[in-house]
Amino acid sequence: MKERMYVDFHVLQTVPPSCVNRDDMGQPKTATYGGTTRARVSSQSWKYAIRERFMEIFPKEQVGIRTRRLIDLIAGYIREDNPEIDEKEAAKRAQTVLEAVGFKFKSKNEEENPDDDEKKTDKKSRKKTENDNTPNANAVFFISKAQAMAIAKMAAFHSGTTYSKEEKQDCVKALQENPSIDIALFGRMLAGNSDLKTDASVQVAHAISTHAVNNEYDDFTAVDDYTKDDNTGAGHMGTAAYNSCTMYRFASLNVTDLNRILQGTDTAEVVREFAEAFICSMPTGKQNSFASATLPDVVYITIRKDRPVNLCGAFEKAIKPSENGNAEPSANALKQYAKNLYEDYDAPEKAITVGRGMEEIAEKMSFHKLLDTLEKAVSNAIAGKGDGFEEAV
Protein backbone atom coordinates (compact mmCIF):
# COMPACT_ATOMS: atom_id res chain seq x y z
CA MET A 1 0.00 0.00 0.00
CA LYS A 2 1.38 3.41 -0.98
CA GLU A 3 -0.75 5.52 1.37
CA ARG A 4 -1.72 5.20 5.01
CA MET A 5 -5.25 3.98 5.60
CA TYR A 6 -7.13 4.21 8.88
CA VAL A 7 -10.63 2.86 9.39
CA ASP A 8 -12.33 4.51 12.38
CA PHE A 9 -15.35 2.85 13.97
CA HIS A 10 -17.79 5.00 15.97
CA VAL A 11 -20.68 3.20 17.67
CA LEU A 12 -23.57 4.39 19.83
CA GLN A 13 -25.18 1.53 21.72
CA THR A 14 -27.92 1.55 24.32
CA VAL A 15 -27.64 -1.09 27.02
CA PRO A 16 -30.50 -1.78 29.49
CA PRO A 17 -29.90 -2.57 33.18
CA SER A 18 -26.69 -4.61 33.17
CA CYS A 19 -23.27 -5.24 34.66
CA VAL A 20 -21.27 -6.37 31.64
CA ASN A 21 -17.90 -5.32 33.10
CA ARG A 22 -17.37 -5.05 36.85
CA ASP A 23 -14.54 -3.96 39.12
CA ASP A 24 -12.93 -5.82 42.02
CA MET A 25 -15.88 -4.90 44.24
CA GLY A 26 -18.47 -6.31 41.84
CA GLN A 27 -19.64 -2.82 40.79
CA PRO A 28 -20.11 -1.81 37.15
CA LYS A 29 -16.98 0.07 36.09
CA THR A 30 -17.21 3.86 35.86
CA ALA A 31 -15.09 6.83 34.79
CA THR A 32 -15.21 10.56 35.45
CA TYR A 33 -15.47 12.53 32.21
CA GLY A 34 -16.52 16.13 31.75
CA GLY A 35 -16.96 16.41 35.50
CA THR A 36 -19.62 13.69 35.72
CA THR A 37 -19.59 9.98 36.46
CA ARG A 38 -20.02 7.80 33.39
CA ALA A 39 -20.61 4.09 32.91
CA ARG A 40 -17.53 2.41 31.46
CA VAL A 41 -16.67 -0.88 29.78
CA SER A 42 -12.94 -1.52 29.49
CA SER A 43 -11.30 -2.04 26.12
CA GLN A 44 -9.82 -5.30 27.41
CA SER A 45 -13.30 -6.63 28.13
CA TRP A 46 -14.56 -5.77 24.67
CA LYS A 47 -11.43 -7.11 22.95
CA TYR A 48 -11.96 -10.43 24.69
CA ALA A 49 -15.53 -10.49 23.38
CA ILE A 50 -14.19 -9.76 19.89
CA ARG A 51 -11.68 -12.61 20.14
CA GLU A 52 -14.45 -14.94 21.30
CA ARG A 53 -16.41 -14.01 18.19
CA PHE A 54 -13.33 -14.65 16.05
CA MET A 55 -13.49 -18.27 17.22
CA GLU A 56 -16.86 -18.51 15.46
CA ILE A 57 -15.74 -16.68 12.33
CA PHE A 58 -12.23 -17.91 11.55
CA PRO A 59 -10.69 -21.40 11.46
CA LYS A 60 -9.31 -22.33 14.88
CA GLU A 61 -5.69 -22.31 13.69
CA GLN A 62 -6.01 -18.65 12.64
CA VAL A 63 -6.90 -17.49 16.17
CA GLY A 64 -4.13 -17.17 18.76
CA ILE A 65 -3.77 -18.50 22.29
CA ARG A 66 -3.11 -16.25 25.31
CA THR A 67 -1.56 -18.24 28.12
CA ARG A 68 1.06 -18.50 30.83
CA ARG A 69 1.10 -22.28 30.42
CA LEU A 70 3.51 -22.14 27.50
CA ILE A 71 5.57 -25.12 28.61
CA ASP A 72 2.47 -27.34 28.66
CA LEU A 73 1.40 -25.99 25.26
CA ILE A 74 4.76 -26.53 23.54
CA ALA A 75 5.35 -29.88 25.27
CA GLY A 76 1.99 -31.06 23.97
CA TYR A 77 2.99 -30.29 20.39
CA ILE A 78 6.39 -31.96 20.92
CA ARG A 79 4.74 -35.21 22.00
CA GLU A 80 2.08 -34.97 19.30
CA ASP A 81 4.70 -35.59 16.60
CA ASN A 82 7.21 -37.42 18.80
CA PRO A 83 5.31 -39.78 21.13
CA GLU A 84 8.56 -41.53 22.06
CA ILE A 85 9.51 -38.43 24.11
CA ASP A 86 7.93 -38.74 27.56
CA GLU A 87 6.00 -35.90 29.23
CA LYS A 88 8.80 -34.90 31.59
CA GLU A 89 11.41 -34.71 28.83
CA ALA A 90 9.03 -32.83 26.52
CA ALA A 91 8.38 -30.25 29.25
CA LYS A 92 12.12 -29.91 29.87
CA ARG A 93 12.84 -29.28 26.18
CA ALA A 94 9.95 -26.83 25.94
CA GLN A 95 11.20 -24.83 28.92
CA THR A 96 14.77 -24.81 27.55
CA VAL A 97 13.79 -23.42 24.16
CA LEU A 98 11.46 -20.82 25.67
CA GLU A 99 14.07 -19.61 28.16
CA ALA A 100 16.56 -19.38 25.30
CA VAL A 101 14.45 -16.69 23.61
CA GLY A 102 13.79 -14.65 26.75
CA PHE A 103 10.89 -16.18 28.67
CA LYS A 104 11.00 -16.23 32.47
CA PHE A 105 9.17 -18.83 34.52
CA LYS A 106 7.92 -19.20 38.08
CA SER A 107 7.74 -22.56 39.79
CA LYS A 108 4.56 -23.34 41.68
CA ASN A 109 6.39 -22.71 44.97
CA GLU A 110 7.24 -19.19 43.81
CA GLU A 111 3.64 -18.38 42.95
CA GLU A 112 1.87 -16.16 45.47
CA ASN A 113 -0.05 -18.10 48.08
CA PRO A 114 -3.81 -17.55 47.89
CA ASP A 115 -5.35 -15.51 50.69
CA ASP A 116 -7.96 -16.91 53.05
CA ASP A 117 -10.88 -16.01 50.80
CA GLU A 118 -9.29 -17.75 47.84
CA LYS A 119 -8.58 -20.81 49.96
CA LYS A 120 -12.27 -21.04 50.72
CA THR A 121 -13.60 -20.37 47.23
CA ASP A 122 -11.04 -21.92 44.89
CA LYS A 123 -10.24 -25.34 46.34
CA LYS A 124 -10.63 -27.20 43.05
CA SER A 125 -8.32 -24.81 41.23
CA ARG A 126 -5.70 -25.00 43.99
CA LYS A 127 -5.80 -28.79 43.99
CA LYS A 128 -5.15 -28.84 40.26
CA THR A 129 -2.25 -26.42 40.68
CA GLU A 130 -0.72 -28.43 43.52
CA ASN A 131 -0.71 -31.55 41.34
CA ASP A 132 0.87 -29.75 38.37
CA ASN A 133 4.51 -28.80 38.91
CA THR A 134 5.12 -27.36 35.45
CA PRO A 135 6.24 -23.71 35.85
CA ASN A 136 4.15 -20.92 34.36
CA ALA A 137 5.51 -17.97 32.42
CA ASN A 138 5.78 -14.73 34.41
CA ALA A 139 3.17 -13.12 32.15
CA VAL A 140 0.53 -14.14 29.65
CA PHE A 141 1.92 -14.45 26.11
CA PHE A 142 0.04 -14.34 22.82
CA ILE A 143 1.10 -17.13 20.44
CA SER A 144 -0.37 -18.58 17.24
CA LYS A 145 -0.78 -22.29 16.66
CA ALA A 146 1.69 -22.15 13.77
CA GLN A 147 4.30 -20.46 15.97
CA ALA A 148 3.78 -22.96 18.79
CA MET A 149 4.15 -25.89 16.40
CA ALA A 150 7.27 -24.40 14.80
CA ILE A 151 9.05 -23.84 18.12
CA ALA A 152 7.97 -27.31 19.29
CA LYS A 153 9.54 -28.86 16.20
CA MET A 154 12.84 -27.14 16.99
CA ALA A 155 12.72 -28.20 20.63
CA ALA A 156 11.91 -31.82 19.76
CA PHE A 157 15.26 -32.29 18.04
CA HIS A 158 17.32 -30.44 20.65
CA SER A 159 18.10 -32.46 23.76
CA GLY A 160 20.82 -30.13 25.05
CA THR A 161 20.47 -27.54 27.80
CA THR A 162 21.68 -24.51 25.80
CA TYR A 163 21.13 -22.96 22.39
CA SER A 164 23.76 -21.31 20.22
CA LYS A 165 23.34 -17.72 19.02
CA GLU A 166 22.31 -18.93 15.57
CA GLU A 167 19.82 -21.40 17.03
CA LYS A 168 18.30 -18.68 19.20
CA GLN A 169 17.87 -16.49 16.13
CA ASP A 170 16.08 -19.33 14.35
CA CYS A 171 13.78 -19.77 17.34
CA VAL A 172 12.98 -16.05 17.43
CA LYS A 173 12.23 -16.14 13.70
CA ALA A 174 9.84 -19.05 14.26
CA LEU A 175 7.99 -16.96 16.86
CA GLN A 176 7.84 -13.94 14.56
CA GLU A 177 6.46 -15.61 11.46
CA ASN A 178 2.87 -16.72 10.88
CA PRO A 179 1.10 -14.54 13.49
CA SER A 180 -2.55 -15.28 14.13
CA ILE A 181 -5.18 -12.78 13.05
CA ASP A 182 -5.77 -11.52 16.59
CA ILE A 183 -2.02 -11.07 17.21
CA ALA A 184 -1.84 -8.95 14.06
CA LEU A 185 -4.78 -6.89 15.29
CA PHE A 186 -4.15 -6.56 19.03
CA GLY A 187 -0.36 -6.97 19.21
CA ARG A 188 1.76 -8.59 21.90
CA MET A 189 4.94 -8.03 23.92
CA LEU A 190 7.59 -9.96 25.84
CA ALA A 191 9.66 -8.05 28.38
CA GLY A 192 12.58 -10.46 27.97
CA ASN A 193 12.92 -10.04 24.20
CA SER A 194 11.77 -6.97 22.28
CA ASP A 195 12.20 -8.88 18.99
CA LEU A 196 9.05 -10.82 19.84
CA LYS A 197 6.98 -7.66 20.16
CA THR A 198 4.19 -7.08 17.65
CA ASP A 199 2.69 -3.60 17.53
CA ALA A 200 -1.10 -3.63 17.49
CA SER A 201 -2.76 -2.50 14.28
CA VAL A 202 -6.03 -1.74 16.06
CA GLN A 203 -6.70 0.61 18.96
CA VAL A 204 -9.82 0.14 21.08
CA ALA A 205 -11.07 2.81 23.47
CA HIS A 206 -12.86 2.23 26.75
CA ALA A 207 -16.57 2.60 26.06
CA ILE A 208 -18.22 5.30 28.17
CA SER A 209 -21.76 6.50 28.56
CA THR A 210 -22.72 9.68 26.74
CA HIS A 211 -24.55 10.89 29.85
CA ALA A 212 -24.11 10.85 33.62
CA VAL A 213 -24.79 7.54 35.35
CA ASN A 214 -25.27 6.43 38.94
CA ASN A 215 -25.00 2.75 39.78
CA GLU A 216 -28.17 1.18 41.18
CA TYR A 217 -28.64 -1.89 43.38
CA ASP A 218 -30.96 -4.86 43.20
CA ASP A 219 -31.71 -6.53 46.54
CA PHE A 220 -32.57 -10.09 45.60
CA THR A 221 -33.65 -13.24 47.43
CA ALA A 222 -33.47 -16.89 46.43
CA VAL A 223 -36.21 -19.28 47.50
CA ASP A 224 -35.22 -22.63 49.02
CA ASP A 225 -37.59 -25.14 47.39
CA TYR A 226 -36.70 -27.93 49.79
CA THR A 227 -37.39 -26.66 53.29
CA LYS A 228 -39.76 -27.19 56.18
CA ASP A 229 -43.29 -25.79 55.92
CA ASP A 230 -42.82 -23.50 58.91
CA ASN A 231 -39.65 -21.93 57.46
CA THR A 232 -40.80 -19.04 55.29
CA GLY A 233 -37.47 -17.20 55.09
CA ALA A 234 -35.34 -16.86 51.98
CA GLY A 235 -32.66 -19.43 51.26
CA HIS A 236 -30.24 -16.70 50.22
CA MET A 237 -30.18 -12.89 50.07
CA GLY A 238 -27.82 -10.58 48.26
CA THR A 239 -27.29 -7.33 46.37
CA ALA A 240 -26.34 -6.91 42.70
CA ALA A 241 -25.11 -3.59 41.30
CA TYR A 242 -26.10 -2.48 37.80
CA ASN A 243 -26.67 0.53 35.56
CA SER A 244 -28.15 1.34 32.16
CA CYS A 245 -26.82 3.75 29.55
CA THR A 246 -26.16 4.74 25.96
CA MET A 247 -22.45 4.20 25.29
CA TYR A 248 -20.02 5.69 22.81
CA ARG A 249 -17.59 3.07 21.52
CA PHE A 250 -14.54 3.74 19.35
CA ALA A 251 -11.87 1.69 17.60
CA SER A 252 -9.36 2.55 14.90
CA LEU A 253 -7.76 0.04 12.55
CA ASN A 254 -4.47 0.83 10.79
CA VAL A 255 -4.99 -1.11 7.56
CA THR A 256 -1.46 -0.38 6.32
CA ASP A 257 0.15 -1.97 9.38
CA LEU A 258 -2.30 -4.86 9.41
CA ASN A 259 -1.53 -5.67 5.78
CA ARG A 260 2.21 -5.63 6.52
CA ILE A 261 1.89 -7.94 9.54
CA LEU A 262 -0.45 -10.45 7.91
CA GLN A 263 1.95 -11.06 5.00
CA GLY A 264 -0.36 -12.52 2.41
CA THR A 265 -3.53 -13.23 4.39
CA ASP A 266 -6.64 -11.60 2.91
CA THR A 267 -6.41 -8.28 4.75
CA ALA A 268 -9.70 -6.98 3.38
CA GLU A 269 -11.55 -10.02 4.73
CA VAL A 270 -9.91 -9.59 8.14
CA VAL A 271 -10.98 -5.92 8.23
CA ARG A 272 -14.52 -6.95 7.35
CA GLU A 273 -14.65 -9.61 10.04
CA PHE A 274 -13.12 -7.29 12.64
CA ALA A 275 -15.80 -4.73 11.78
CA GLU A 276 -18.54 -7.33 12.20
CA ALA A 277 -17.04 -8.58 15.47
CA PHE A 278 -16.48 -5.11 16.94
CA ILE A 279 -19.96 -3.90 16.03
CA CYS A 280 -21.91 -7.03 17.05
CA SER A 281 -19.92 -8.45 19.98
CA MET A 282 -20.92 -7.91 23.59
CA PRO A 283 -19.09 -8.69 26.85
CA THR A 284 -20.81 -11.52 28.69
CA GLY A 285 -20.73 -10.20 32.26
CA LYS A 286 -23.97 -11.04 34.13
CA GLN A 287 -25.81 -11.78 30.87
CA ASN A 288 -27.72 -14.65 32.49
CA SER A 289 -29.03 -12.26 35.14
CA PHE A 290 -29.77 -9.25 32.91
CA ALA A 291 -30.04 -10.52 29.29
CA SER A 292 -28.64 -7.15 28.22
CA ALA A 293 -27.26 -8.06 24.78
CA THR A 294 -28.22 -5.33 22.29
CA LEU A 295 -27.13 -4.11 18.86
CA PRO A 296 -25.89 -0.57 18.17
CA ASP A 297 -28.27 2.31 17.54
CA VAL A 298 -25.73 4.00 15.25
CA VAL A 299 -22.62 2.79 13.42
CA TYR A 300 -20.48 5.48 11.77
CA ILE A 301 -17.36 4.37 9.88
CA THR A 302 -14.81 6.71 8.34
CA ILE A 303 -11.70 6.17 6.24
CA ARG A 304 -8.83 8.58 6.82
CA LYS A 305 -5.31 8.94 5.45
CA ASP A 306 -3.86 11.19 8.16
CA ARG A 307 -4.54 9.67 11.62
CA PRO A 308 -7.28 8.17 13.81
CA VAL A 309 -9.81 10.64 15.24
CA ASN A 310 -11.78 9.75 18.36
CA LEU A 311 -15.04 11.74 18.54
CA CYS A 312 -15.59 11.25 22.27
CA GLY A 313 -15.40 15.02 22.70
CA ALA A 314 -19.01 15.10 21.51
CA PHE A 315 -19.95 13.89 24.99
CA GLU A 316 -17.53 15.84 27.19
CA LYS A 317 -20.67 17.77 28.11
CA ALA A 318 -22.96 15.02 29.33
CA ILE A 319 -26.20 14.49 27.39
CA LYS A 320 -29.19 15.64 29.45
CA PRO A 321 -32.09 13.21 29.99
CA SER A 322 -35.10 14.02 27.82
CA GLU A 323 -38.38 12.55 26.65
CA ASN A 324 -36.45 11.35 23.58
CA GLY A 325 -34.17 9.22 25.74
CA ASN A 326 -30.40 9.26 25.32
CA ALA A 327 -29.74 7.56 21.97
CA GLU A 328 -31.31 10.21 19.71
CA PRO A 329 -29.70 13.27 21.35
CA SER A 330 -26.40 11.36 21.48
CA ALA A 331 -26.53 10.80 17.72
CA ASN A 332 -27.29 14.49 17.17
CA ALA A 333 -24.39 15.50 19.40
CA LEU A 334 -22.02 13.14 17.59
CA LYS A 335 -23.07 14.46 14.18
CA GLN A 336 -22.72 18.11 15.18
CA TYR A 337 -19.35 17.56 16.85
CA ALA A 338 -18.05 15.77 13.76
CA LYS A 339 -19.30 18.56 11.46
CA ASN A 340 -17.62 21.23 13.58
CA LEU A 341 -14.39 19.23 13.76
CA TYR A 342 -14.32 18.72 10.00
CA GLU A 343 -14.72 22.47 9.45
CA ASP A 344 -11.62 23.13 11.56
CA TYR A 345 -9.56 20.10 10.50
CA ASP A 346 -9.60 17.67 7.60
CA ALA A 347 -12.72 15.61 6.99
CA PRO A 348 -12.41 11.87 6.35
CA GLU A 349 -11.96 10.57 2.82
CA LYS A 350 -15.24 8.67 2.99
CA ALA A 351 -17.94 7.88 5.56
CA ILE A 352 -20.73 5.30 5.76
CA THR A 353 -23.34 4.69 8.43
CA VAL A 354 -25.96 2.28 9.74
CA GLY A 355 -28.87 3.47 11.85
CA ARG A 356 -30.35 6.94 12.11
CA GLY A 357 -28.76 10.28 12.87
CA MET A 358 -25.57 10.50 10.77
CA GLU A 359 -27.09 10.61 7.25
CA GLU A 360 -26.10 14.27 6.82
CA ILE A 361 -22.38 13.45 6.90
CA ALA A 362 -22.29 9.80 5.78
CA GLU A 363 -24.00 7.50 3.29
CA LYS A 364 -26.67 5.41 5.00
CA MET A 365 -26.93 1.72 4.15
CA SER A 366 -27.82 -1.66 5.62
CA PHE A 367 -25.37 -3.43 7.92
CA HIS A 368 -24.40 -6.14 5.43
CA LYS A 369 -23.93 -3.62 2.64
CA LEU A 370 -21.73 -1.60 4.97
CA LEU A 371 -19.51 -4.65 5.49
CA ASP A 372 -19.39 -5.34 1.74
CA THR A 373 -18.55 -1.71 1.04
CA LEU A 374 -15.79 -1.62 3.62
CA GLU A 375 -14.23 -4.87 2.39
CA LYS A 376 -14.24 -3.66 -1.23
CA ALA A 377 -12.75 -0.32 -0.24
CA VAL A 378 -9.87 -1.98 1.61
CA SER A 379 -9.29 -4.50 -1.17
CA ASN A 380 -9.11 -1.78 -3.80
CA ALA A 381 -6.82 0.39 -1.67
CA ILE A 382 -4.39 -2.49 -1.18
CA ALA A 383 -4.45 -3.15 -4.92
CA GLY A 384 -3.70 0.52 -5.59
CA LYS A 385 -7.13 1.35 -6.98
CA GLY A 386 -7.88 4.33 -4.73
CA ASP A 387 -10.19 4.15 -1.74
CA GLY A 388 -12.59 1.80 -3.55
CA PHE A 389 -15.83 3.39 -2.39
CA GLU A 390 -16.92 4.51 -5.84
CA GLU A 391 -16.90 0.90 -7.05
CA ALA A 392 -18.25 -0.58 -3.84
CA VAL A 393 -21.19 1.70 -3.11
Tell me what each language-model feature is.
Residues M1-R40, Q44-V393:
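Basic polyanion-binding and macromolecular-assembly surfaces
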